[in-house]
Amino acid sequence: MTNSSSTSTSTTTGGSLLLLCEEEESWAGRRIPVSLLYSGLAIGGTLANGMVIYLVSSFRKLQTTSNAFIVNGCAADLSVCALWMPQEAVLGLLPAGSAEPPGDWDSGGGSYRLLRGGLLGLGLTVSLLSHCLVALNRYLLITRAPATYQVLYQRRHTAGMLALSWALALGLVLLLPPWAPKPGAEPPQVHYPALLAAGALLAQTALLLHCYLGIVRRVRVSVKRVSVLNFHLLHQLPGCAAAAAAFPAAPHAPGAGGAAHPAQPQPLPAALQPRRAQRRLSGLSVLLLCCVFLLATQPLVWVSLASGFSLPVPWGVQAASWLLCCALSALNPLLYTWRNEEFRRSVRSVLPGVGDAAAAAAAATAVPAMSQAQLGTRAAGQHW
């Protein structure tokens, strides 16, 4: 994941990574609002991602396989919000021509710019990979048998997936220096880092849409009630086996031939029967999640493609596309925790009164969760 604007047609080696500090004085008044937006995203994203990491590390009920991938993404987003965004906000407020640090720190030919680009690339790449891991985890949780899910997401396998996401991101970041434009050199006709960024975003979008739309189809045709963002499965997982044991089906009387007719499956009790509104709400939640991803990433895809083929892209379009993508780093915790009752309880226990409003707003639409004792297994929320 690389910044396409770093390889744009601008040859200003001292400019900001997001072209917030161009040499043109006409942009001076427009850099301030963008810097203020980065400042707000930095503060909000740092607090939100830090809170999720703290809650998961402090409460054992939150230490599940799915939350491990969420925490991995929050750690990557925290590096973007706490380390990279403040630098962009400060650089955007500096006068034109003084976007880089003073002194000889950057005498090595854009080393500070490469450092910021590498930090951004590492954080965003791990974050996007974590979104894919969360989507794949949820897709397999619904579409595969519990035993298969447990085998795939053993603790060792989960740790390997997390380590692989960082190793892959680090490998991609190490490819940045050879492709960095040389000071005073003519810009190439094809910018491969920008094309690589566009290809990575398109691949991630395809995987997310496949997983989440597959979940929507499964929820629509299934009798199980699923809260997709919370992932409380009340069918197919052993919780329904416990319900079936509590409501056994009586065998039919033997027929004339002496053979007993096979027992017909007993319907689930009314408390476990899904309601159409709840299934529709789960589907809308997934579609909303997909829309957020598309809105945050697709503008950057087109900007990266245009920059990759040396097509002129207005500065405002570049800044807006990167702001949307970076906003995903700040909103990442809310995407996965806003309807999770365990997270709300944890927030209320740490900050009394803070989560009451969110709990009241979600009370009418929340899907009741089954405890681990009711599930009888750790398939839906395998602990680390």
Swiss-Prot record:
GO cellular component: ciliary membrane; cilium; cytoplasm; nucleus; plasma membrane
UniProt entry keywords in alphabetical sequence: Cell membrane, Cell projection, Cytoplasm, G-protein coupled receptor, Glycoprotein, Membrane, Nucleus, Receptor, Transducer, Transmembrane, Transmembrane helix
Extracellular side: 1-35, 95-116, 180-195, 307-310
Gene Ontology process terms (BP): adenylate cyclase-modulating G protein-coupled receptor signaling pathway; cellular response to light stimulus; G protein-coupled receptor signaling pathway; locomotory behavior; motor learning; neuromuscular process controlling balance; neuronal action potential; phototransduction
Tissue: Expressed predominantly in the striatum. Expressed also in olfactory tubercle, nucleus accumbens, amygdala, and neocortex. Spinal cord, pons, and medulla expression remains discrete. Also expressed in peripheral tissues, including adrenal cortex (16 dpc to 21 dpc) and cochlear ganglia (19 dpc to P3) and also at moderate levels in retina (18 dpc to 19 dpc) and spleen (21 dpc to P7).
InterPro entries named in the record: GPCR_opsins (IPR050125), GPCR_Rhodpsn (IPR000276), GPCR_Rhodpsn_7TM (IPR017452)
UniProt subcellular location: Cell membrane; Cell projection, Cilium membrane; Cytoplasm; Nucleus
Membrane disposition: Multi-pass membrane protein
SUPFAM superfamilies: Family A G protein-coupled receptor-like
Protein name: G protein-coupled receptor 88
Species for this entry: Rattus norvegicus
